[in-house]
Amino acid sequence: MRKKNATIKSVEVETQTDMTMREIETILKIVANTNNDNNDNNNDNEIEHETTIVIADKADKIDKIKKKLEFLDSVYQPEQRTPEWYQHRHGLITASSVWKVFGSQSTQNQLIYEKCAPIDVEKYNKVNTESSLHWGQKYEQLSKDLYEMLNGTKIREFGCIKHPNPEYYFIGASPDGINVCPLSRLYGRMLEIKNVVSREITGIPKEDYWIQMQIQMEVCRLPECDFLETKFVEYEDESAFDSDSNKENDEIKWNYNVEGKRRGVIVYFIKNDKPFYEYTPLTITSKSQFDQWFEKVVQSYDGITWIKNIYWRLEVYSCVLVLRDKAWFNSAIPKIQELWKTVETEKVTGYEHRAPKRRIVKKNDTISQNKKQTKLEFNDDGSFSQQHIENEKICHSGLFL
């Protein structure tokens, strides 16, 4: 009996692969033959039947996920960062913006104005490495690496995807990634990453993030999404990084600080006037391994400007499962459709009245250190004004230490 249970368990694990129906039938025959070699009783037969159902259910689920991912792969995608790609995104209400449909009138006006106005591709080529937006981009790959390592899986991006239903042609989503490893229990689960700068991580998604994930799951027709929030802290310099470690453990636990928190290094380069990063592999556990890796990285980018090494520590890692809510989408879609009809109409009749109102800043105005109280200021094209950008810098000062 013990031998049979062990066989059944191993078959269940093996069926979490990318299988064809022929392979599934072969596995079922193996199970049947193995069971015939034992002295079965009625209880054994019940176990065999239940196991066969489990295997078939898992195989069917894997096959469905595989077909969905193949469909997402087949969706037309303009080459990233090209004018066509920016235009493609501009012609959609993307998942990260849908929450604005349910916001105040001024928030809706902002979205309508943004979608009606001609796209300015040049503004996307500008990079502010001190912004919270860039902070999130900088740590996104590292968050993915940690997620993959902790869950034994593989994440892939699928670009900006339009809703497969032609009726909702104006809705799009760009998920941070989808689990594509068929051996993983997370196969087919989506991933949304938020690299927090200062906000407290509670494990409960903000409403706009929840809406974003619902739209992503709706567009990709997948039932689950992991909401991953991380909070990284950067050391002032290498000396501060070195002092936050046990020297005796530098050859076995260099990637953890004295409190047992994971840490590492990002190598910061500039190429074509834009930053790009190389991340220390999470498998590196000693100072000597890092030194060898760093030397190879610098040599491989010979001729490209190395700026500095960024030394980081992971303070918080929170991952929460969010399930698809079809009922919510069905109740929300009429309002999303209504706003898009307004966009299409006012592209013809005029949208200038939707422009954000300019605000004159008085000399005695003070800037709140609370980001929620910072007043938004926009240019005529709907982008943040320089004054707002400066305010944001002040609000975030001291958060990158």
Regions found by a protein language model. Give the residues of each.
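Accessory terminal regions of nucleic-acid processing enzymes
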Residues: M1-L401
